[in-house]
């Protein structure tokens, strides 16, 4: 990855200098790399002043204080945690395992339907080995024996989701003599819905098939719900048309589908009760994560009381963490990830809004050097930020060395150093009133959105996969990381750019594309929406081409893209808490009522 970062920083600086026709507009950038780290000498003259000059005119984003207070968070209690409920959960878990084992006596379609139900209810993580065994057994002959559109489409989606090779031409039997999808398929809403969901597992070489299927199925499904023929099926259709299943956050899908499954015509009461109790049990774990991280954040002194210019969004950061990896056994990973998200949120506001260019250069240099003594040259308000970041990263690396004998510090440091060098480049653009080209912007913005840092933190915090060899993924598989993070960047820009422009921030991808292409904002947003779809197809391809990569790692990365669609679906759900309030309530606050 280092070579890509080096080339990007150099080329971006060169292009800016040329287009502004003034070397004084952009500070000369001399970039060097040492031991795989980004080490950029971006400061021409470094001030030694340590005080924050109160006479400096500073911008303000006027962020609202958090709606979830510290005392409220600490008061959270889950009535379904532990006690008799824990025993009941274990009993039901065993009952469902028996049900899964008895699937061998049923036809393959029923087996796949049961697996799909387990996944959507959010309990499949308990039965991964059994599910894989069923899929291995069914895979070889399933497609050849199925004739219905529903059965073929369901199998296509599940097998591709789990890494099995299924060619797209299995849908050829549903075409007429002219090669078009048969009009008679319109009599099968369940099959059409399954086909719509299956299409979102197609890859970029299957782009034409994707658009044909999605256009055909979307038109039919929109017409179907107008007539409301079947309440349960119509609910599924509306849900899918909002966001396809493959793009949905797993825990939010579980919460929604548990309610939908309760109204389904063939609900299994044991499975429903288990899903409810298990959801509440996992939610209790996430509440403990929230309380722990809320205490940590308050103890750092970096919260709203001290850093009133920045977003204080620890609850949203916890929401991000559970959206990316929710399973109870990964509590340490979630907590370390929340630290990363909290630092990204705070320091992004320092670079975007509060800091002067001189201060930002000092901070970037301090992180590049990764030396505790560098703190002495920082202004006072930056010192606790650097100190807490420095201590947290080193402590996390020490944990990994003690527990697994792996030195993760180089990977963590490189990610943060790269991020802040890109933040600094964007700050220089703003300082000089420079409008980057769309390419210049995206060459930096895919990383400056924080996605790669989020991924590397999560991965370094997981016990089993984090070996030195696997950590080198971040150099060898640079393009894959860029794809996932690009989805995050596009959704972030679509959700936040209007608010950020109002307070005078840098232009985002929408504005860069509008300026370069001469299109309207509506057209630019449509273009980015299309690019998100195209990027998902590339993600699907990379996932299929790299089956040797850890399922846990791949899950973290793809779930980050899913969380981006969720958090920025209705605007900026990270900065504006009202946009994410319902999701916080459903995943972190309110359990599902149980008898």
Swiss-Prot record:
Its EC number is 4.2.3.20. SUPFAM superfamilies: Terpenoid cyclases/Protein prenyltransferases, Terpenoid synthases. Binds 3 Mg(2+) or Mn(2+) ions per subunit. It is an enzyme of class 4 (lyase). Residues 1-39 form a transit peptide. Keywords: Lyase, Magnesium, Metal-binding, Mitochondrion, Transit peptide. The keyword Cytoplasm does not apply. InterPro entries: Isoprenoid_synthase_dom_sf (IPR008949), Terpene_cyclase-like_1_C (IPR034741), Terpene_cyclase_plant_C1 (IPR044814), Terpene_synth_N (IPR001906), Terpene_synth_N_sf (IPR036965), Terpene_synthase-like (IPR050148), Terpene_synthase_metal-bd (IPR005630), Terpenoid_cyclase/PrenylTrfase (IPR008930). It catalyses: (2E)-geranyl diphosphate = (4R)-limonene + diphosphate. Mg(2+) 1 binds at residues 348, 352. One of its GO terms (cellular component) is mitochondrion. Mg(2+) 3 binds at residues 492, 496, 500. Pathway: Secondary metabolite biosynthesis; terpenoid biosynthesis. It comes from the Eukaryota. Mg(2+) 2 binds at residues 348, 352. The Asp-Asp-Xaa-Xaa-Asp/Glu (DDXXD/E) motif is important for the catalytic activity, presumably through binding to Mg(2+). Sesquiterpene synthase involved in the biosynthesis of volatile compounds known for their medicinal efficacy for treating enteritis, dysentery, itch and some cancers. Mediates the conversion of (2E)-geranyl diphosphate (GPP) into (4R)-limonene. Can only use GPP as substrate, no activity with farnesyl diphosphate (FPP). This is Sesquiterpene synthase 1. It comes from Toona sinensis (Chinese mahogany). The lineage of its organism: Eukaryota, Viridiplantae, Streptophyta, Embryophyta, Tracheophyta.
């Amino acid at each position: 990855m280092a070579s890509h970062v080096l080339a990007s920083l150099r080329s971006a600086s060169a292009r800016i200098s040329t287009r502004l026709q003034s070397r004084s507009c952009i500070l000369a950038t001399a970039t060097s790399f040492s031991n795989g780290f980004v080490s950029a000498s971006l400061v021409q003259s470094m001030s030694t002043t340590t005080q924050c000059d109160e006479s400096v005119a500073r911008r303000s984003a006027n962020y609202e204080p958090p709606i979830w207070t510290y005392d409220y968070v600490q008061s959270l209690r889950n009535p379904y945690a532990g006690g008799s409920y824990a025993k009941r959960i274990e009993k039901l878990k065993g009952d469902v395992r028996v049900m899964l084992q008895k699937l061998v006596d049923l036809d393959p379609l029923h087996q796949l339907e049961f697996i799909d139900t387990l996944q959507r209810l959010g309990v499949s993580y308990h039965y991964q080995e059994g599910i894989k065994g069923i899929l291995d057994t069914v895979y070889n002959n399933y497609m050849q024996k199925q004739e219905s559109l529903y059965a073929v489409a369901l199998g296509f989606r599940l097998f591709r989701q789990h890494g099995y090779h299924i060619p797209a031409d299995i849908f050829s039997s549903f075409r007429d003599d002219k090669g078009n999808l048969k009009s008679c398929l319109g009599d099968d809403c369940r099959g059409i819905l399954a086909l719509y969901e299956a299409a979102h597992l197609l890859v970029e070489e299957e782009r034409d098939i994707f658009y044909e299927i999605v256009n055909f199925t979307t038109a039919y499904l929109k017409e179907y719900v107008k007539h409301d023929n079947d309440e349960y099926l119509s609910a599924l259709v509306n849900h899918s048309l909002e966001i396809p299943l493959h793009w949905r956050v797993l825990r939010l899908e579980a919460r929604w589908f548990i309610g939908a499954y309760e109204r389904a015509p063939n609900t299994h009461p044991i499975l429903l009760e288990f899903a409810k109790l298990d959801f509440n049990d996992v939610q209790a774990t996430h509440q403990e994560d929230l309380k722990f991280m809320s205490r940590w954040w308050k103890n750092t002194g970096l919260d709203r009381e001290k850093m009133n210019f920045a977003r204080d969004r620890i609850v949203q950061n916890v929401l991000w963490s559970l959206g990316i990896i929710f399973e109870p056994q990964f509590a340490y990973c979630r907590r370390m990830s929340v630290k990363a998200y909290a630092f990204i949120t705070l320091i992004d506001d320092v670079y975007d809004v509060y800091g002067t260019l001189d201060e930002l250069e000092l901070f970037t240099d301090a992180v590049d050097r990764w030396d505790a003594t560098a703190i002495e040259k920082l202004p006072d308000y930056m010192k606790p930020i650097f100190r807490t970041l420095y201590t947290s990263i080193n402590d996390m690396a020490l944990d990994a060395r003690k527990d697994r004998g792996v030195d993760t510090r180089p990977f963590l440091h490189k990610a943060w150093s790269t991020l802040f060098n890109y933040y600094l480049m964007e700050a220089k653009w703003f300082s000089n009133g420079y409008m980057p080209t769309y390419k210049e912007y995206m060459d930096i913005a895919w990383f400056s959105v924080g996605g790669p840092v989020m991924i590397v933190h999560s991965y370094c915090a997981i016990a089993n996969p984090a070996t030195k060899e696997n950590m080198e993924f971040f150099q060898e598989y640079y393009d894959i990381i860029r794809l996932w993070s690009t989805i995050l960047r596009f959704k972030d820009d679509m959700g936040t750019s209007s608010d950020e422009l109002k307070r005078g921030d840098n232009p985002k991808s929408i504005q860069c594309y509008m300026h370069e292409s001469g299109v309207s904002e509506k057209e630019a947003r449509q273009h980015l929406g299309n690019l998100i779809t195209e990027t998902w197809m590339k993600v699907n391809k990379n996932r299929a081409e790299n089956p040797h990569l850890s399922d846990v790692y791949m899950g973290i990365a793809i779930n980050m893209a899913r969380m981006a669609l969720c958090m920025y679906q209705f605007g900026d759900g990270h900065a504006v808490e009202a946009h994410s309030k319902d999701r916080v309530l459903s995943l972190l606050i309110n359990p599902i009522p149980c008898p």
